[in-house]
């Protein structure tokens, strides 16, 4: 019997979306191993063709998790208005899914089946093509460099007379330091930079912004940044900057005016939750105004206020137009007014059509990825599932598969291709440090780098845009903020993984399967075996890994050819040793 409770289809969602004019992707969920076939029937929703004369497509099972199988079909036709229904069959019965009704009888009328009203160009699911092809190097400016292959590790505070505030640093990194090390970044294979905040701010992290129109003097000048952008573009690379529009510094001109003038301030409606008189609390005191978290120095902006919106729309345009940056990573995006983001997107795309907008949202982001706000989000879910499988070893490959499939099917596939996958960032512990936390390590740290290597392999071969935090290639570690934002160890790498990164990035960028190919899981077990394929119409790449501290000889699905990259692989027995991997190219 077909398990009716497991059947799911949601129209106009990640289960039914357009990828081009006259092209639709349709998905269906069913119980594990329940259906023996699934057929999609589709036709023109505005003509009179009988429903039993509809065109048909056999749906492919594209993924399975612990409970469900997922089927998919791609409609490439001459239709821009489509209606459709599903025919499902197991050994005992045939059922039809028609507009959320499961029936044993054939549907009789178009009003009884699913509708895709019209494939509108502006609603086609996609991201700028260059984002799919990007391999991102994320730089925390204060920590990276102030010279070629060097950083002073010296705080160089600066008193800004115009603002009347001291601007702090911790390690002394500069824009000039980034310019002088572009050869290093390019040599590793990265083709996109993402910089944490560079605008004028009081603290070294620069998430408490004082001036949105200038580079922080501690980092350099506006002209230094123009030079950086020019140098990046001359190498065929892209550059993304950090935008902090959820909150500002408590010495930002508008909030400073509120403190000074109270209810008479023309900016009193620029901020959330003000109680007059507004005072700046002492350290340890909770503010009486709304902030980012409870950070007293970061009052929350009222982004639904038209004046606030207009101010930051100009900031958006200014950096895209005057400095020619290629996109924005947008801080605390899920706390900002959604109409603000819709307006922001309109300005960004009008100013620079292929600019990208990446939201900092740590959870499910369906609501923000409908094509009216963001192109992408920072995919912390990728980090979490890799942490639990590779670093902690607390889930097996079956559980890893289930969570990975959920992540991959959460959005339309073109949106998944642009998700910013990461293992660490300025906000979380270094992944290599997490690899010391597995119970199986137990004082034996010989597996730490092997676990880290497998995670990087997964990052650079999976669907999505990989992002690497500066210094991961040199073994930077750290659980606490001051440690995971450590100075770049130019002279004394903790662990030199540059060859690994070069090899994997070169493989990714030279093989279209990793950029535009689909993703199919081929095999997994209850231990550490995980095998997947990335494929285009003309080529297929198979990636096999063993995230377990024992050899595994059950890799029967591997191609009968030499791997292009491997570690601890026994070709004769189709076996992978502890933490081994192999990548095969099949033409």
For each feature predicted by the language model, list its residue ranges.
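Non-catalytic, glycine-rich low-complexity segments
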Residues: 1-34, 107-129
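Carbohydrate-binding surface patches
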Residues: 15, 25-27, 521-558
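C-terminal beta-strand-rich structural cap/linker in extracellular carbohydrate-active enzymes
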Residues: 32, 82, 572-587
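Aromatic- and glycine-rich beta-strand/loop motifs that create alpha-glucan
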Residues: 32-79, 89-103
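Substrate-binding/active-site clefts of carbohydrate-active enzymes
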Residues: 134-136, 140-191, 198-317, 321-322, ...
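Aromatic/acidic polysaccharide-binding cleft in carbohydrate-active enzymes
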Residues: 142, 371, 376, 420-441, ...
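The substrate-binding groove and active-site-proximal loops of carbohydrate-active enzymes
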Residues: 162-176, 208-221, 295-309, 326-335, ...
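Active-site-proximal helices and loops of the catalytic beta/alpha 8
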Residues: 229-237, 247-263, 321, 331-419, ...
């Amino acid at each position: 019997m077909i398990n009716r409770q497991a059947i799911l289809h949601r129209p106009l969602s990640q289960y039914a979306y357009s990828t081009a004019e006259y092209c639709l992707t349709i998905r269906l969920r069913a119980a594990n191993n329940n259906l023996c076939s699934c057929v999609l029937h589709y036709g023109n929703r505005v003509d009179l063709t009988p429903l039993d004369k509809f065109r048909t497509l056999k749906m492919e099972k594209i993924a399975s998790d612990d409970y469900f199988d997922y089927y998919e079909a791609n409609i490439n036709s001459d239709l821009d208005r489509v209606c459709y229904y599903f025919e499902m069959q197991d050994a005992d019965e045939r059922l039809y899914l028609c507009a959320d009704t499961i029936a044993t009888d054939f549907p009789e009328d178009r009003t009884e089946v699913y509708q895709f009203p019209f494939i509108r160009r502006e609603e086609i699911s996609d991201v700028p093509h260059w984002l799919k092809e990007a391999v991102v190097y994320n730089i925390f400016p204060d920590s990276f460099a102030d010279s070629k292959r060097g950083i002073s590790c010296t705080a160089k505070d600066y008193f800004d007379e115009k603002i009347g505030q001291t601007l702090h640093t911790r390690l002394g990194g500069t824009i000039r330091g980034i310019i002088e090390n572009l050869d290093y970044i390019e040599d590793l294979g990265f083709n996109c930079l993402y910089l944490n905040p560079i605008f004028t701010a009081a603290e070294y992290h620069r998430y408490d912004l004082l001036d949105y129109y200038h580079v922080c003097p501690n980092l350099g000048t506006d002209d230094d940044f123009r030079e950086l952008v020019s140098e990046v573009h001359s190498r065929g690379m892209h550059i993304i900057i950090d935008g902090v529009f959820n909150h500002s510094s408590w010495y930002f001109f508008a909030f400073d005016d509120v403190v000074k003038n109270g209810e008479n301030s023309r900016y009193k409606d620029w901020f959330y939750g003000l109680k007059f008189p507004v005072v700046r609390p002492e350290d340890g005191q909770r503010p009486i105004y709304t902030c980012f978290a409870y950070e007293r120095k970061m009052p929350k902006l009222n982004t639904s206020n038209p004046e606030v919106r207009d101010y930051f729309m100009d900031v958006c345009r200014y950096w895209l137009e005057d400095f020619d940056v290629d996109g924005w990573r947008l801080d605390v995006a899920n706390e900002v007014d959604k109409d603000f983001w819709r307006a922001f997107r309109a300005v960004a795309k009008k100013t620079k059509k292929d600019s990208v907008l990446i939201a900092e949202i740590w959870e499910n982001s369906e609501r923000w990825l409908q094509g009216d706000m963001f192109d992408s989000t920072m995919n912390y879910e990728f980090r979490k599932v890799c942490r639990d499988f590779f670093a902690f070893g607390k889930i097996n490959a079956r559980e890893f598969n289930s969570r990975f499939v959920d992540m991959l099917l959460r959005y339309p596939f073109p949106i998944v291709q642009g998700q910013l996958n990461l293992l660490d960032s300025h906000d979380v512990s270094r992944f290599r440090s997490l690899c010391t936390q597995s119970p199986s390590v137990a004082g034996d740290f010989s597996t730490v780098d092997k676990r880290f290597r497998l995670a990087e392999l997964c990052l650079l071969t999976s669907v999505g845009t990989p992002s690497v935090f500066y210094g991961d290639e040199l073994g930077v570690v750290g659980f606490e903020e001051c440690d995971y934002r450590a100075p770049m160890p130019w002279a004394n790498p903790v662990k030199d993984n540059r060859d690994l990164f070069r090899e994997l990035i070169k493989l990714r960028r030279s093989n279209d399967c990793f950029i535009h190919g689909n993703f199919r899981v081929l095999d997994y077990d209850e231990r550490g075996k995980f095998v997947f394929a990335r494929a285009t119409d003309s080529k297929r790449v198979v990636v096999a890994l063993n995230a377990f501290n024992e050899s595994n000889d059950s890799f029967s699905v591997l191609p009968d050819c030499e791997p292009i990259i491997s570690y601890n692989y026994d070709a004769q027995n189709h076996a992978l040793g502890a933490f081994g991997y192999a990548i095969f190219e099949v033409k």
